[in-house]
Curated annotation (Swiss-Prot):
Listed name of the protein: Probable calcium-binding protein CML18
Lineage summary: Eukaryota, Viridiplantae, Streptophyta, Embryophyta, Tracheophyta
Annotated EF-hand domain residues: 1-36, 37-72, 86-121, 122-157
Domain of life: Eukaryota
Protein keywords: Calcium, Metal-binding, Repeat
Keyword Metal-binding tagged: yes
InterPro entries: EF-hand-dom_pair, EF_Hand_1_Ca_BS, EF_hand_dom, EF_hand_pair_protein_CML-like
SUPFAM superfamilies given in the database record: EF-hand (SSF47473)
Binding site for Ca(2+) 4: D135, D137, D139, C141, E146
Residue positions binding Ca(2+) 2: D50, D52, D54, E61
GO molecular function: calcium ion binding
PROSITE patterns noted in UniProt: EF_HAND_1, EF_HAND_2
């Protein structure tokens, strides 16, 4: 994911605009996405991202987490296959939040619904344009492989 897009997502999470995401802000966004988590699960997510252990996630920590954390950027190091499996599971969970009808594809309307819940003022037409930019197979939707490429910054753009 390009840094400009990561910054835009970060700003959605950073509700008070102080340049860092608190556990409360993370929990609020997850509730808006229809994925309310208990305090323990929110804390676990924060711990995964908060490499300097100050209790908040700043933009650099957020970017490192979403672009494949390394041990130098707060990652756990360890077995690459374990990290890849954990990353794949997290991506699948994120994909399911967007895929409201569980058909394995994210439509412009599904993307629009989630972005509106996050406070974005975009239109369905804007969402269609976003989807076209990553829709490698031309079906008008984003499947999991396209979503994975988009989230990993690995191409898929036309």
């Amino acid at each position: 994911m390009p840094m400009a897009e990561l910054e835009q997502v970060f700003r959605r999470y950073d509700a008070n605009g102080d340049g860092k995401i608190s556990a409360e802000e993370l929990a609020s966004v997850l509730r808006a996405l229809g994925a309310p988590l208990g305090p323990g699960e929110v804390r676990r997510m924060m711990d995964e991202m908060d490499s300097d252990r100050d209790g908040f996630v700043d933009l650099s920590e957020f970017a490192a987490f979403h672009c494949g954390p390394t041990p130098a950027h707060g990652g756990k190091g360890g077995d690459a296959k374990d990290q890849e499996a954990a990353s794949e599971a997290e991506l699948r969970e994120a994909f399911r939040m967007y895929d409201a009808d569980s058909n394995g594809k994210i439509s412009a309307r599904e993307l629009h619904r989630v972005l509106r819940q996050l406070g974005d003022k975009c239109s369905v037409a804007d969402c269609s344009r976003m989807i076209r930019s990553v829709d490698a197979d031309g079906d008008g939707c984003v499947n999991f492989d396209e979503f994975k490429k988009m989230m990993g910054g690995g191409g898929g753009r036309r």
